[in-house]
Amino acid sequence: PIIEFTRALVPEGKNIHAFERDGAKPTVTKVANHNELHEHITAKVAALQTEQHNTIAIICKSAAESAAAYEELSSIEDIKLVKSTSAEYEQGIVVIPAYLAKGIEFDAVIIYDASKDVYSNESVRRLFYTACTRAMHELHLYCVGEVSPFVLGADSDSFELITTP
């Protein structure tokens, strides 16, 4: 299900040959504000840990967004911030900018804010695609406000849209 979803994120996606990953259909959760975003991500991380996912990445667009997200999510036990100066990648729960996640795979990936405000410029489409394809088994996208147009280009059957009350 993840590959089907991510192929639709880039124009040449149908030509991409990737290994199929087992796992659930990706979810896209719309939240009203950043407080709600942090509550939902904290709860999702706890659920993923219960499901025995050993590597969980919260992927952000930039290093600045990663640092801010790390501060807001610091209540999550053993969470780590990966920076360009990090000596090596550590397993567990990490907050990481998308450009540093390239080449690394995680059991579960949470896209920190896949909103139109963050991911709508064509220049970041490949970065968004790269972030989403880091997931081996579970992919969860969260949006504060409107969903990224990149997501809206995917077949609505390829993901589950969740709108919080």
Where are these regions (language model features)?
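Short secondary-structure boundary/hinge segments and terminal tails
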Residues: T27, P149-F150
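Short, hydrophobic alpha-helix immediately C-terminal to the catalytic nucleophile
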Residues: I3, T42-A43
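Core RecA-like ATPase module of SF1/SF2 helicases and allied nucleic-acid translocases
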Residues: E20, N35, E39, A46-H140, ...
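Conserved coupling/interface region of RecA-like P-loop/ASCE motor cores
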Residues: P1-N33, A63
